[in-house]
Regions:
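Hydrophobic alpha-helical segments at protein termini of multi-pass membrane proteins
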Residues: 1-209
């Protein structure tokens, strides 16, 4: 049995100390890191609870429950940030990526502790794939929120649409992982390639301007 709350405390403790030492300018980054790990911890409990209530098998829990719960939980700190502080667009995107990155990091650490780290090649691809899919979902949601929350009539519909897009992408990723075999490695490579393609497109657009 993996006591993920103990892992959470061990990972959050140095972040809290660093947040106190770095001052107010860097405080937001550390708080969103802690929030990302916190919602990952809560997502694990909620996933387990819903899987038990719905009597879902491993595939259903992975493809139907986990993507919905995890993406909704990652959205909560961002919505709170938007409602309370009304930040600028760049800050929204940075916050979304930080939450997603911390979520993926905590998830990977828990996976390593539970399953071992003896298979380097598999762990290498999984680390990049899981990190990239969460960051990609964070980019979709963060970039979209920066646009939709500047327009009152788009706030609710836009947020729901972005959440749906992130859930769909996450569910496809989990489905390929659950299928196994070559599809598993396609899933690991796909988000990395999408992030790289997005950055390349953004770079070319900036060069044209």
């Amino acid at each position: 049995m993996t006591y993920i709350e103990n892992i959470f405390l061990c990972m959050v403790s140095p972040l809290l100390v660093a947040a106190l030492c770095m001052g107010r300018r860097q405080l937001r980054f550390f708080l969103f890191c802690i929030a990302g790990m916190g919602v990952c911890l809560l997502s694990a409990y909620i996933n387990t609870f819903l899987a038990a209530v719905c009597q879902a098998d491993a595939l259903a829990a992975t493809v139907e429950i986990a993507p919905v719960v995890e993406e909704m939980m990652k959205l909560l700190p961002l919505v709170f940030y938007l409602l309370v502080f009304e930040p600028e667009g760049d800050k929204i995107k940075a916050a979304a990526i930080t939450v997603a990155l911390a979520f993926a990091t905590f998830e990977n650490v828990c996976y390593l502790i539970q399953n071992g780290a003896d298979r380097f090649s598999f762990i290498f691809f999984r680390g990049f794939g899981t990190g990239a899919v969460h960051v990609l979902c964070g980019l979709i949601v963060g970039g979209g929120l920066a646009y939709t929350w500047q327009r009152t009539w788009l706030k609710i519909a836009g947020t729901c649409g972005l959440l749906g897009a992130a859930i769909t992408l996450h569910a496809i990723y989990n489905l390929l992982i659950a299928y196994g075999g070559a599809a598993q490695y396609v899933a690991y490579a796909l988000p990395v390639l999408l992030v790289a393609a997005g950055k390349l497109s953004a770079f070319r657009l900036s060069q044209r301007k």
